[in-house]
Amino acid sequence: MQRNDCVCNDYKSLPRVFLFEPGGSSAEVLLYGGKVVSWKNSQGEELLFMSKKAAGRSPKGGISLCFPQLGNTGTMKEISSSKNNNVKSLDNIPLRLTPTGNPSSVDLTLKTTANNSNMWPRSFEFCLRVSLGPDKMTMSSHIKNTDSTSFSFTFALQNYLSVSDISEVRVEGLETLDFLNNLQQGKRSTEQPDAITFDGEVDRVYMRTPGNIAIIDHDKKRTIVIRNEGLPDAVLWTPWDNTAKAAVSGFCDKDYKTMLSVDSGVLEKPIILKPSEEWKGYQELSIISSSYCSGQLDPKTVAFYAKP
């Protein structure tokens, strides 16, 4: 039986764990920050985008965990994109591996105190479980306040998805929602009732999403469905041909053509935990072998197929 407690260092000399499930899906998770650097479906197709420019302990792409803060303060007025310099990512923080005995899941933990933490002067426990199912991957996050005082935080999972051609992709599930447009200094707007397509740079924070978002790739004839619990907000980002912004974010000039970032998070209203209180967030990514070319996606259909 394949084991997930075998740690290898062959991804840019970074320790990682391999996950497998009987249907053929696989994933690779770094011990630094619990970053997912590969997720393949049962046909062996890579579903996550990783930039060739990536280097060091923060390879760009995949799925990153951002905690305890996005933006300057976390208040709704000052929410900023998860792609700016104010992101507090866990990518450079080593997590403790707890073998599960199951080759399709892994548990990673981080326990800090206010005195020994370089990332945040608070005492807390963070637990992450990454699990694989048939053409499905789930990420469960658990944060407990072990400090003597209350603290607040925001949280996000940055999902860099591999697409065939960004101009041939559409996103459904964000129609008519309010969003903050970071290309217009955070101006609050309302999305149109149609599916979102791309012909230029996009950097938006959507509030109170319905829990199911579909990324439809016509050329690859597949749909990735993101289902969330406890992560009500979403960030939609593509630098398009803004080479300066792509470079600052750690991507190559042409990376935008085959990449789309659709993030899940708690951004509008930061989580407040009193001592001993806990918070949980859940994300499920699933694959449907269809591009829904016949028309606008029926949310009930997405909800049906996305459920475990």
Regions found by a protein language model. Name each.
Residues 27-29, 130, 137-145:
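Short, well-ordered beta-strand segments enriched in hydrophobic/aromatic residues
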Residues 22-83:
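Acidic-aromatic substrate-binding/catalytic surfaces of carbohydrate-active enzymes
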Residues 103, 121-125, 132-138, 148, ...:
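Coil-to-beta-strand transition motifs
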Residues 30, 38-41, 149-156, 295-296:
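Short, hydrophobic/aromatic beta-strand segments
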Residues 1-25, 32, 42, 111-115, ...:
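Beta-strand-rich recognition/accessory modules
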Residues 146-149, 289:
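Short, acidic/polar linear motifs in exposed loop/turn regions
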Residues 150-152, 160-235:
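Active-site/ligand-binding surface loops and adjacent short beta/alpha elements
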